[in-house]
Each structure stands twice: as C-alpha cells, then as structure tokens.
C-alpha cells in the first residue's frame, strides 16, 4: 500500500511539473503571437486563484486598451486572441493538422495579413485547413478546394494548387 501511495505521489508531482513547464512555454509563445497578430499589446495565461474553480485565465491587452477579460474585446480581437493561443499551443506541442473554420470572418484586411503570416510560420510542422470566404486568406493559401452545387443539387469539388496557377500565368504572360 505504501508503494502505491508513493507511486501516486510521484505521478502527481510529475504531472504538476509537466503542466507547469508546458503552461510557461505556451504563455511565452502566446505573448509572442499576440504581439505579432495585434502589432503590439500584451497577453498572458495564469492559473486561476479560485480553488473551487481551477483553470487557466486568459488576460489580453490590445494596443491602446486596458488589460481585461475576453468578454471585453470586440469580435475581431477575440478571434485574434484565440488564434494567438491556438498558435502558441501548436508551437509548443505541434499537431499534424489543424482545421480553422472562418476564424478570419471578423478580421479586417490588415489583420488577415498578420493572421496568414502567423499560420505560415507553423506550416513546417502543422498542415492547416482553413475554411474561409476571405479573399486575402484565399490568396495566401498554397492549395485551394472549392465546393459548389450544380442545378441538380449535386456538390462538386474543385482543387487548385496556387503554385501551378502562378506558373501557368507566367508561361501565358
């Protein structure tokens, strides 16, 4: 029984250490991506002080604003903050792919440019599937897939590799 308690204690210590190390790394990257996406400002992650509701609190201060909760941010600011957090996690713990569904919908053209540049930084380890209607995001893609419906109600899928399109334009040009 004593060995079981010792094992459980060791496991709890290891989990706490790994959580703390990972949280610190994600927090650091979150701040970096936040500043890049907002062209300034500050963001951080902190463990909750409330023992009855443990968790992680997100603090964000876009340039020219006070630090506050996500609820105080505009739709575009929330989208960029969430994107900064996701990209920070992917930088620390890469995933083979990530699907983003219209995360750029609330972004203006300048912010879409920062968003696509940030995605591009991680494409060496993570493949992004971005569902979008935003022309600037589409133009930043390597590969496009389009879905349309014909008159008979049948969906058609088209694909286009943008590098091939650019090469074809150069030959025709």
Regions found by a protein language model. Name each.
Residues 1-173:
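Terminal ABC-like ATPase head and other globular end-domains that cap long coiled-coil arms
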